[in-house]
Amino acid sequence: QFNVMPERYKDYSLLELYDELDISMRYIAYYTEIPSPVGLKYTDKVKINEKEVDSECRLITIDTPYGELTREIRLTSDRNWRTSRSCIKTREDIKKATWLFRNTEFYFIEENFDKGDKFIGDRGEPQFFLPRSPYQSLHVDSSWMTLEDLIYAITDLPSEIEELMNAIDESYDRLYEEIISCRDKVRIINFGENIDAYLLSLKYFEEYLVPFWEKRSNQLRRAGIYTHIHIDGHFRPILKYLKDLPFDGLEALTPEPQGDVLIEEMKEYIGDKVLLDGIPAILFLPIYSREELYSCMEKLIRLFHPRLILGISDEIPEGVDEEGIERVRWISEYCKSFKTGKGDSYGL
């Protein structure tokens, strides 16, 4: 059930729950009610209008010199507004969107980062995720295109779609420059790409994703900022690329039984990169035993420690019962005993 905690924890604040379980925090603007440190603004030329169709449907229209871009959003069962019809369908729509991004600028809000840093305190290193690469932005952010429409556009209108991707990339310039100017406090950055290798071809992976990452991640790394990338889908087709990706860490790689790769294969292919997370989320559901969770956790620690920030790939399932949360506590206690050299199958 959405937005409902098990009875034992129903009155806990987010920070109280983290402290009760003795676990670390990572992201400053994810379920924290802290505003994102990534801002977005348009030039005065951009006009955006929102029209309510009914209580659960709205139309958002963006005026451009080439006509309107319109997307439909609907209120879903989790009470969030989500895109139900994307806005780029035709060659003319691509032209409109290119104009829009030429009049769009992302920027860094240092004040929001400071708020998040204060909120997290000593519970972890404050981090946030960047806007996605142009390819991922166009279809993962479904307000723009469906995956099917993107693939057709790349095939039929390559120059137009690449011009749009360039416009998206350039809209990030100020953001990266301002982050780098705050490198004394911003030390780790996430590329929140949400990669699933079965939703892209290796050709597009090499042509559109890797070059963007090399440009932008290395821009940050040259300034002394560590980077990691969020790969929370299937990733067997890209195993051979992992060790050479321009990141210090790989976040949310998900092994079997939820993903499509063995833990041993992850170890073989990621080289000396830091693994963030690694425990499949479904192991916190009652259909899996603590013994199965322990086996996975112990293997991750044995193979990846000390280049490991143990966590859930990529988050605990919504609607878990009290046992699911108690498994988080149990892992925390195990890890503390592991640090003292006393780790065993605690609590099984």
PLM regions with names:
Residues 44-103:
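A contiguous, low-structure linker/loop signature
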Residues 3-9, 63, 95-348:
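Active-site loop segments of alpha/beta catalytic cores
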Residues 4, 20-23, 45, 50, ...:
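Short linear motifs in intrinsically disordered/low-complexity regions
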Residues 27-33, 85-89, 345-348:
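A generic structural motif
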Residues 14, 54-58, 112:
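Generic hydrophobic, aliphatic-rich segments that mediate packing or membrane embedding
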Residues 28-29, 40, 79, 97, ...:
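Short, low-complexity intrinsically disordered segments
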Residues 2-43:
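Segments that shape or occlude catalytic/ligand-binding pockets
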Residues 35-38, 46-50, 138:
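Intrinsically disordered, low-complexity segments enriched in polar/charged residues with Gly/Pro
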